[in-house]
Amino acid sequence: MARIAGINIPDQKHTVIALTAIYGIGLTRAQQICAATSIAEDAKIKELSEAQIDTLREEVAKYIVEGDLRREISMNIKRLMDLGCYRGLRHRRSLPLRGQRTKTNARTRKGPRKPIRK
């Protein structure tokens, strides 16, 4: 298995699909990486030479992926909560952020129902 950005990439999959195993790289970005490195999208990882895998590593290193991306996202959420803005308050209360209704729905975000005490 090839190791890119600290992740073991599946050998038997096509390059585009295998790159999506990295957190922060979706299908579109994987296609852009393949185009930039001039590697065929339908080539399997096990068919690539070591030099081609090195170019993939260099291209992926240009993007924020994996742990750095996770850390950046959590820091952005923490910043919103510290600011006390509307989105930060909604994060703090575990409610939907983007204007969805909460009277009847939003069970995933709010968690299981709590019984009403008498």
From Swiss-Prot:
Functional description taken from the UniProt entry: Located at the top of the head of the 30S subunit, it contacts several helices of the 16S rRNA. In the 70S ribosome it contacts the 23S rRNA (bridge B1a) and protein L5 of the 50S subunit (bridge B1b), connecting the 2 subunits; these bridges are implicated in subunit movement. Contacts the tRNAs in the A and P-sites.
Coiled-coil regions, chain positions: none
Name of the protein this chain belongs to: Small ribosomal subunit protein uS13
Alphabetical list of InterPro entries matching this protein: Rbsml_uS13_C, Ribosomal_uS13, Ribosomal_uS13-like_H2TH, Ribosomal_uS13_bac-type, Ribosomal_uS13_CS
An example Gene Ontology CC term for this record: cytosol
Record-linked NCBIfam families: uS13_bact
PANTHER family, per database record: 30S RIBOSOMAL PROTEIN S13/40S RIBOSOMAL PROTEIN S18, SMALL RIBOSOMAL SUBUNIT PROTEIN US13M
GO molecular function: rRNA binding; structural constituent of ribosome; tRNA binding
GO BP term (any one): translation
Family: Belongs to the universal ribosomal protein uS13 family.
Gene3D superfamilies on file: 1.10.8.50, 30s ribosomal protein s13, domain 2 (4.10.910.10)
Pfam families linked: Ribosomal_S13
Keywords: Ribonucleoprotein, Ribosomal protein, RNA-binding, rRNA-binding, tRNA-binding
Record's subunit section: Part of the 30S ribosomal subunit. Forms a loose heterodimer with protein S19. Forms two bridges to the 50S subunit in the 70S ribosome.
Region Disordered: start-end pairs: 94-118
